[in-house]
Structure formats: C-alpha cells, structure tokens
A protein has these predicted regions:
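SDR active-site strand-loop-helix element
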Residues: 4, 28, 70, 103-108, ...
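Rossmann-fold NAD(P)-dependent oxidoreductase module
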Residues: 13-17, 94, 129, 218, ...
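NAD(P)H-binding glycine-rich loop region in Rossmannoid oxidoreductase-like domains
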Residues: 33-98, 108-113
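Conserved catalytic Lys-bearing alpha helix of Rossmann-like short-chain dehydrogenase/reductases
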Residues: 87-91, 122-133
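Conserved beta-loop-beta element that borders a ligand/cofactor-binding pocket
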Residues: 107, 128-158, 162, 167-170
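Glycine-rich "substrate-gating" loop/helix at the edge of Rossmann-like oxidoreductase active sites
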Residues: 143-149, 170-181, 205-208
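Mid/C-terminal beta-alpha module of Rossmann-like enzyme folds, strongest
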Residues: 190-225
C-alpha cells in the first residue's frame, strides 16, 4: 500500500493505522529527511518523489495494490488549482501504468452546484482527475476533520482561549458537519477491505451539524472558560 501526504495531519496518522492492520506500507515523500523522528519510519519503505513529476511516481507505484492520495494544496497562489489537477492526473496515469488496483482519496464535502470556495472546488475536481486514467477511485468527502493538532481544532482552540471577545466574522455562522480524526481513519482503512467502494463518492461526517460559533462555545464549556 502506498501512502502520499505523510507529512500532513491525516496522512501521518494513517500510516500507523495501516501498519497495525497488518499492511506493508510504502510512503512517498519529496524529502525523506522530513520524516525523521516519526515513530513508524523504520517500519515502512520510503520512496522520494513529487506528484508534479510523473517519472518520479512510476517507481513509487511499482508493485502497489492500492494507493492513498492524501495531497492537496494549501497555497493561495493564482494557479494552485491547476497544479492540483496536474498532480492528480500524473498520479492517476502512473497508477494505471503500474496496474494499481485502486486509489483511495480524501476530498472535501460540499454541494458542487453551490458557490464553493476555490480550494474546496479544487479538491472535488482532484477526485475526478484521479479517475481520468481509469483506475477505480474511492473518494471520501469530509467537511472539517477534528482532532488535537488539526488545523480546524487548533483554530477553534486559539480563538476561544486567546480572543475571548471579538467581532464575529461571517464564517463563524457557517454550518459544518465535523468528523473526528479517528472516524476518518476508520473509513480510510476499511475502504481497503471493501472492494465495492471502488468508483464511489462517499460523504462522511459526524452526527451533528454545527456552526463554528457553536464549536467555540462547546470548547469553552469543556475547558471551563
């Protein structure tokens, strides 16, 4: 099993879950030195490569049964979405060339018929681009992933603890369906053992629909602030 995006929040937590489940894991990294200190580093095969460099993906995907695509740009550059599309197409083509059985991708939850942000629309377009080469893709779509260290959790923690009084921006009233990191990892690992998920888009989320403001209030109550 190949895992990309292992320096990120979710990819780095997916690797030990796969190892615990008994899978042989290979990880792709642009710079393997950035992985030093990870407690799983000696249990995996590390291959250096870049999703924007097609030729570097061929050895990374050689002999792989399934691949996790956990890459998306957090850049605000003018062409980040085009770079994301090119990276996904490179990965899909390299997976096809190596006869990879399936790609598993974690994208973003949102109605494509509404006015999505460029980043969210790009994540959904990435899922489509991955499948263009013909390799079956299991695409999970999640809103915000919550867990200690996640961007969303740390933002809520910081604003609640450091900014007790503020003029609320509009996004505070945005409704979202948060999901715990543990549940996301459960879905990602279970997909390997669920072949019927191939070719499907699966929306995942927690039981509650909340605003960011609701979550900040709940955090404050739990912390006794």
């Amino acid at each position: 099993v190949l895992v990309t995006g292992v320096t990120g929040y979710i990819g780095g937590r997916l690797v030990p879950r796969l190892l615990d489940a008994g899978y042989r894991v290979r990880v792709l990294a642009r710079d393997k030195n950035r992985l030093q200190g990870r407690n799983w580093i000696n249990q995996v095969e590390v291959v250096e490569g870049d999703v924007l460099n097609y030729s570097s993906l061929l050895p990374a995907l050689s002999g792989v049964d399934a691949a996790y695509y956990m890459v998306h740009s957090m850049s605000s550059s003018a062409d980040f979405d085009q770079r994301d599309l090119q990276a996904a197409r490179n990965f899909g083509e390299a997976a096809r060339a190596n006869h990879v059985g399936r790609i598993i991708y974690l994208g973003g939850l949102g109605d494509p018929n509404t006015d999505l942000s460029r980043h969210l629309r790009s994540r959904q377009q990435t899922g489509a681009a991955l499948s263009e080469a013909g390799v079956p893709v299991t695409e999970f779509r999640a809103a915000i992933v919550m867990g200690s260290g996640s961007v969303s959790f740390e933002m809520i923690r910081y604003l609640t603890e450091r900014v007790p009084v503020m003029i609320c921006p509009r996004w505070v009233f945005t409704k979202v369906q948060p999901i715990a990191i543990k549940d996301v990892l459960d879905y990602l690992v279970a997909a390997l053992e669920t072949p019927e998920s191939a070719g499907k888009i699966i929306e995942i989320g927690g039981a509650d629909v909340l605003t960011y403001g609701n979550m900040m209030l709940e955090y404050a109550q739990v912390r006794g602030l």
